[in-house]
Structure formats: structure tokens, C-alpha cells
A protein has these predicted regions:
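Short, charged/polar low-complexity linear motifs in solvent-exposed/disordered segments
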Residues: 58-61, 68-70, 88, 108-111
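A generic alpha-helix propensity feature with a strong bias for hydrophobic helices
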Residues: 7-10, 75, 84
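A short, amphipathic edge element
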Residues: 64-81
Length: 141
């Protein structure tokens, strides 16, 4: 599965680079749900990112059922860096909206729908091997 091009700013080992990478990850996560593709999320996930494993499982469920999500699943409302990074990890306070959405069958019929939800918490990226990886997204209602 081919990833969309990584924005130039997401290649920099700076807090701004980490933020650009997290935003890119959310774009890829949306793509993975709207045109269900396995293998996109793991290409960006660190070995310790449990939420990344959960997200790939959600995509796997869509693929298995032949379903897709109609609109982007995640929308970042706020992302603010927390202090300095330690051990190559840059953390952020995040607010994310999951807009009201529909899950569609392969034929385009509505399989299910859900109301909008706001989640918040921490996200983080870790710099390893000359690039960013998603460290963790711990976001809850």
C-alpha cells in the first residue's frame, strides 16, 4: 500500500516537524478508513503505539466486511506541544473531533452511522532512524 507523499516539514527533527508528522498520520488514517487499505498505518507506527494497532484492526474489519467510511474520520481541532522532548519523543495535548459519519457497503448503501464525538488527550511522535514515528495517541471522550 502506497502512502501519500510526506510533507517536507514532517521530515524535520523539530517540534513543528513532529506536529506536521502527526497531522500527516491523521490524514493517512482518514485515507485508510475511506478507501480501506491495510498496511498504511503500520508504516508510520512505532513498535509501542497501541492505538495504531487498534486503528489497523478497525481498518481490517472494514476490509473484511467490504465497507468504507464515507467522510474523514478524524479532524484535529487543537494540537499543542508539551515542553521539551525527551528520548526523541515530542508530546502534544490534542483535541480531535470525529464528525458524524456513515459507514457504507461496497454498493454504497448505509451499513451504519454514528454521531459526532469529541476526544482529547495526548499524542506523541518519536524520532528514530532519521524520521518520525507515531509514539502514541491516547485520546478519549
Amino acid at each position: 500500500s502506497a502512502l501519500p507523499p510526506l510533507p517536507e516539514e514532517a521530515t524535520e527533527n523539530t517540534p513543528e516537524g513532529a506536529e506536521a508528522f502527526i497531522r500527516y498520520y491523521v490524514d493517512v488514517a482518514n485515507l485508510a478508513h475511506q478507501t480501506p487499505q491495510l498496511g498504511l498505518v503500520p508504516q508510520l507506527a512505532s513498535d509501542v503505539c497501541e492505538s495504531c494497532v487498534t486503528m489497523e484492526q478497525q481498518v481490517s474489519d472494514l476490509v473484511a466486511k467490504g465497507e468504507r467510511v464515507e467522510e474523514p474520520v478524524y479532524q484535529i481541532d487543537k494540537i499543542e506541544p508539551i515542553g521539551g522532548s525527551t528520548g526523541g519523543v515530542q508530546l502534544f495535548n490534542m483535541n480531535v473531533t470525529l464528525p458524524a459519519n456513515r459507514i457504507l457497503t461496497a454498493e454504497g448503501a448505509e451499513a451504519s452511522s454514528y454521531e459526532a464525538t469529541e476526544i482529547s488527550g495526548r499524542g506523541g511522535a518519536i524520532w528514530e532512524g532519521d524520521r518520525w514515528w507515531v509514539y502514541e495517541l491516547t485520546l478519549t471522550p
